[in-house]
A protein has these predicted regions:
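Short, well-structured alpha-helical interface segments that form or flank functional binding sites
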Residues: 36-42, 80, 188-192, 196
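Non-Sec secretion/translocation targeting segments of pathogen effectors
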Residues: 14, 254-261
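Short active-site loop/helix that positions an aromatic residue
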Residues: 44-62
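Residues immediately flanking
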Residues: 18, 42-44, 85-87
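ADP-ribose/NAD+-binding catalytic cleft of ART/PARP-like enzymes
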Residues: 1-39, 52-55
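Surface-exposed flexible segments
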Residues: 19-36, 91-107, 240, 244
Length: 261
């Protein structure tokens, strides 16, 4: 096989199992996982043609990254998600894999191999991305749906949350300035809880699990929500216990949602 240098695309499409989506968004990267490159298609027409010649061909043989002969399993569209991604950096690191065909091969085989090689493009390394959209695969295949739902990486979620926290804390400090000395003394525990939660959230940052970042962004005043819970549990230690408190709040919300269904 031979590699051909390609211009950096402005956006790419990547097919993956739904079960991988959360970890991909937490990571903010498409990983190579043992390969030299991670692979994409530059438009949906190429992606559909690529799928029709690979994952949609049940029983078709292929070689894995390790060189092992495998066969494609039964294709279940609902198990997959199609990601539209914008690469973070326009690096000169893109290649097309041109499949080599033995000399003397029929012209039809040579043409088919070349056309297949044009379907995908590889990024040499792990691709960091932003502005992701998740396209529903069943609807893409049956209805031609090309518009996806925006999905956010942990870094993007934390950037939004940190701005929310900063604004909320600034508003809180302004309101503290309006309190009398006696009111400040009476609300010392509340003030301590707000300061503690602000500090702990900033220390944890984007290391928080993605679902907990989403949970906090769903709250009108995330710092106030956390500080109230912290005051109820103020006898616990800092650090990991703060994380446990947040995890407990998230789990409680999920339990309440499950009970309503």
């Amino acid at each position: 096989m031979a590699y051909v240098k390609e211009h950096a695309p402005s956006e790419v499409y990547h097919l993956t199992k739904k079960e991988n989506l959360n970890s991909i968004l937490e990571d903010g990267r498409i990983r190579r996982f043992g390969d030299t490159e991670c692979w994409f298609c530059i438009d949906l027409q190429k992606m559909k043609a690529y799928m029709e010649q690979t994952v949609m061909c049940e029983g078709k043989p292929y070689y894995s990254v390790t060189g092992q002969l495998c066969r494609y399993p039964k294709f279940v569209p609902g198990d997959y998600v199609l990601l539209k991604l914008t690469p973070c950096r326009q690096e000169d690191n893109w290649y097309r894999w041109e499949q080599e065909i033995p000399a003397g091969s029929p012209a039809e085989l040579v043409r088919a191999a070349h056309e297949f090689s044009l379907l995908k493009i590889g990024y040499r390394g792990d691709l960091a991305f932003h502005n992701a959209e998740a396209i529903d695969v069943p609807r893409f295949l049956t209805e031609g749906v090309t518009q996806g739902e925006p999905v956010h990486t942990s870094t993007e979620l934390w950037d939004t949350l940190s701005r929310r926290i900063e604004d909320e804390m600034a508003d809180y400090m302004h309101r503290l300035d309006l309190r009398t000395r006696d009111e400040l003394i009476q609300t010392a525990d509340e003030i301590d809880a707000m300061m503690t939660c602000d500090c702990e959230l900033r220390l944890l940052g984007e290391c928080l699990p993605r679902e907990e970042l989403v949970f906090l962004l769903e709250q009108d005043r995330p710092l106030e929500q956390m500080s109230k819970a912290w005051m109820e549990h103020r006898n616990v230690d800092l650090g990991e216990t703060f994380q446990s408190l947040l995890t407990g709040l998230y789990a409680g919300q999920q339990h309440n949602m499950d009970m309503k269904m």
